[in-house]
Amino acid sequence: MKKWILTILIFYASITNAATLVGQVVGIADGDTITVLDAGHTQYKIRLAGIDAPEKKQAFGQVSKKSLSDLVYEKVVSVEYSKQDRYGRTVGKVLVNGVDANLEQVKRGMAWFYKKYQNELLLQDRLDYLHAQENAEKDRIGLWVGNDSVAPWDFRKTAR
């Protein structure tokens, strides 16, 4: 019985083991990747969790980058994170003045909800991102203006 309870506690600790990074955004790589400089002058590449923005050479790629820049560039942000991706980037939710920048990119039609990694998100974030994309599609906002939007994961496959 004690082993079972300990196993459950370890499991829940691992899925809620999020840390927070605070710093100023000093770079925008694209519509879902930024660079944050913390108070100790350490730079971190941050990949916005739960979304996938168009690639730079893809339609809406530069527009998506500009949108993210308008949201966060030179602003102090909090990044709630719990992992790094295979490229060494910290993956997390970026908050600027209490606003979820990841969600805002999806609302603006500047990124897709990245369902492939949805299990890494809190349930409420999953629902928010899903509804934001549905609304952007319905209202034909941003990359949803035309019928020819290509998801970044499909674009990357054809670019290889």
Predicted regions and their residues:
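Small beta-barrel nucleic-acid-binding modules, primarily SNase/OB-fold domains
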Residues: 2-5, 14-160
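Small beta-barrel nucleic-acid-binding modules, principally OB-folds
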Residues: 10-12
